[in-house]
């Protein structure tokens, strides 16, 4: 990234309380889509420092929708809480088990409300939500899954 753009982003993050990574078929919705771009851009030392200050020193929030959630995972912000490289054991999003894109209404159940985003949600409450993705399957080793549930980092689960 150009120095001026990095400086502008750094300044904007320093003045923010929330950083939001959007989705919406950006980057042609290629595998990992815009998540690859976000992961590359935000690994810049200045950008990384700005995000980590936002989250750790100013109690800021991060949100990722669709490809934006992939970006949070690729950056390491989920589940590590810091920008870092992934390794073979890192959680990831991958292709749906049916090997094609889905677009339908799904039911999810709140299993943790520790996040400020869900502070008012009732545990066990079920919601009907639109879902549209080709890479919506979260994969992690069992020990990671157990840890994520134990820490309350899994907010919702699909239900029938």
Predicted stretch roles:
Residues 3-63, 69-82, 87:
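Flexible gly/pro-rich beta->alpha loop and the following alpha-helix that scaffold active-site loops
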Residues 4-15, 48-55, 84-160:
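Amide-donor transfer/coupling interface in amidating biosynthetic enzymes
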Residues 22-24, 65-68, 75, 111-113, ...:
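Fold-independent oxyanion-binding glycine-rich loops
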């Amino acid at each position: 990234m150009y120095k001026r753009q990095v400086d502008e982003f750094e300044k904007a993050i320093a003045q923010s309380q929330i950083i939001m990574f959007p989705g919406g078929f950006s980057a042609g919705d290629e595998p990992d889509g815009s998540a690859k771009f976000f992961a590359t851009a935000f690994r810049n030392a200045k950008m990384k420092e700005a995000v980590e200050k936002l989250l750790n020193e100013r109690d800021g929030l991060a949100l990722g929708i669709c490809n934006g959630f992939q970006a949070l995972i690729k950056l390491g912000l989920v589940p590590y809480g810091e920008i870092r490289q992934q390794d073979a054991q890192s959680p990831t999003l991958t292709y749906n088990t049916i090997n094609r894109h889905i677009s339908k209404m799904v039911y999810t159940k709140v299993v943790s409300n520790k996040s400020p985003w869900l502070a008012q949600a009732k545990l066990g409450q079920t919601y009907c939500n639109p879902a549209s993705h080709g890479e919506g399957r979260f994969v992690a080793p069992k020990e990671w899954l157990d840890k994520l549930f134990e820490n309350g980092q899994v907010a919702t689960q699909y239900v029938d």
